[in-house]
């Protein structure tokens, strides 16, 4: 491609498709390099061994960095591998401020693996009350999801970043529910953003991957070390597949969000439903924050059945929806957080953060919305049939 024909794309989907280019052969789709080792006789030793670097993974990482608005992005074999790499900044004697509720895997990592490393964890249930007094000298990292899983509470990323940085602490944001299409935490002050690429980025429930991104060169070294030293890196074939999948992210999410809005409207009129949790639903303040820092509500939400409702009967009877954990795929899913993703929670934390047995999480796909609504009617009737 000649220099005069080059244009820096500004649109999100344009970047997903054209962020990387096969300069050698001008192929419309960059090739996949499966080699485990590369010749080193020449001057260029960028690629020596697949664990250190791989052209296909580099193409993916360059694309992910462009989408995140980041200088550096790194691909891992799972979202938890990305989270573990980011939390590798913590050392013995440090304290982590962990936003709650949070994904069960993150909770388990903090309460087991970090504890073994002599890292303390303090749980934060309401970031609006976070103050200077919370930042003792040992606090090095704040880790949060916004919106949270599974009750979709929203946190003001910019406000927490400003407070954390004032005390020399880092802010890590799990952006799985929003993706960089809807929300870009690094632009709001976060130091690292992580997400399970298994979910929306891949979008077809057939690939496991994670990503961490940063603008800080020192943190980039840490994140790359998380790949290199532990071997937690995404293989070339999975990198290639994710590179292809992410090209349709915006199209999928727009359809998923539209379905979600219509389903929430339907459920809000149902007498069987006590409460619906979606990003910004808890208060006018949270709605304002969500509208300011994100471009929508995403396609994951939870509902609380009224007393007497049987969530397990609801999930079992629900047609079309797959009764399974995960989210972000083209197919709609139903799960019961208390028994699945958040089963690792101590009972006191389940009670405190609203992970109730009657809580049902729905991840909406791209099916025709009238079919999803018809399926939900069947599930609601089954939940109260006893």
Residue ranges and their predicted role:
Residues 2, 10, 111, 121, ...:
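PLP-dependent enzyme catalytic core of the Aspartate aminotransferase-like
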Residues 67, 267-271, 318:
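Acidic-histidine catalytic/liganding microenvironments
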Residues 275-360, 364:
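Conserved C-terminal alpha-helix-loop-beta "cap" of PLP-dependent enzymes
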Residues 230-231, 318-328, 379-386:
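A common structural junction motif
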Residues 2-32:
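Short conserved active-site loop signatures built around small residues
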Residues 21, 37-38, 214-219, 246, ...:
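Short loop segments at secondary-structure junctions
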Residues 2-8, 72-269, 277, 288:
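Conserved PLP-enzyme active-site core in the AAT-like
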Residues 32-33, 37-84, 88-89, 105-112:
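Conserved N-terminal alpha-helix of the aminotransferase class I/II PLP-enzyme fold
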């Amino acid at each position: 491609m000649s220099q005069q024909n080059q244009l820096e794309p500004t649109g999100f989907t344009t970047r997903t498709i054209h962020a990387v280019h096969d300069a050698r052969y001008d192929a419309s789709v960059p090739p996949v390099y499966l080699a485990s080792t590369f010749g080193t006789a020449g001057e260029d030793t960028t690629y020596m061994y697949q664990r250190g670097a791989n052209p296909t993974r580099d193409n993916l990482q360059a694309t992910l960095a462009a989408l995140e608005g980041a200088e550096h992005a790194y691909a891992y074999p799972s979202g938890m591998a990305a989270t573990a790499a980011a939390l590798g900044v913590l050392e013995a004697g440090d304290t982590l401020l962990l936003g709650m509720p949070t994904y069960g895997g993150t909770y388990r990592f903090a309460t087991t693996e970090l504890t073994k490393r002599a890292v303390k964890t303090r749980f934060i249930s309401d970031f609006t009350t976070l103050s200077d007094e919370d930042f003792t000298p040992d606090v090095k990292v704040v880790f949060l999801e916004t919106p949270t899983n599974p009750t979709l509470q929203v946190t003001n990323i910019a406000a927490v970043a400003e407070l954390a940085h004032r005390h020399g602490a880092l802010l890590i944001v799990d952006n799985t529910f929003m993706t960089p299409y809807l929300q870009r935490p690094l632009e709001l002050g976060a130091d690292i953003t992580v997400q399970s690429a298994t979910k929306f980025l891949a979008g077809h429930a057939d690939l496991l991957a994670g990503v961490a991104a940063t603008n800080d060169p020192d943190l980039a070294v840490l994140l790359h070390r998380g790949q290199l030293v532990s071997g937690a890196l995404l293989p070339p074939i999975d990198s290639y597949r994710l590179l292809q999948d992410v090209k349709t992210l915006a199209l999928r999410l727009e359809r998923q969000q539209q379905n979600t809005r219509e389903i929430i409207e339907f459920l809000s009129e149902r007498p069987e439903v006590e409460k619906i949790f979606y990003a910004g639903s808890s208060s006018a303040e949270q709605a304002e924050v969500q509208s300011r820092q994100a471009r929508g509500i995403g396609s994951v939400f939870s509902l609380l059945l009224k007393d007497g409702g049987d969530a397990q009967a609801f999930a079992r009877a629900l047609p079309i929806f797959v009764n399974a954990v995960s989210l972000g795929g083209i197919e709609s899913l139903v799960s019961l957080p208390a028994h699945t993703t958040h089963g690792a929670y101590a009972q006191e934390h389940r009670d405190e953060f609203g992970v109730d047995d009657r809580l049902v999480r729905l991840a909406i796909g791209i099916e025709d919305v009238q079919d999803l609504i018809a399926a939900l009617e069947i599930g609601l009737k089954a939940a109260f049939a006893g």
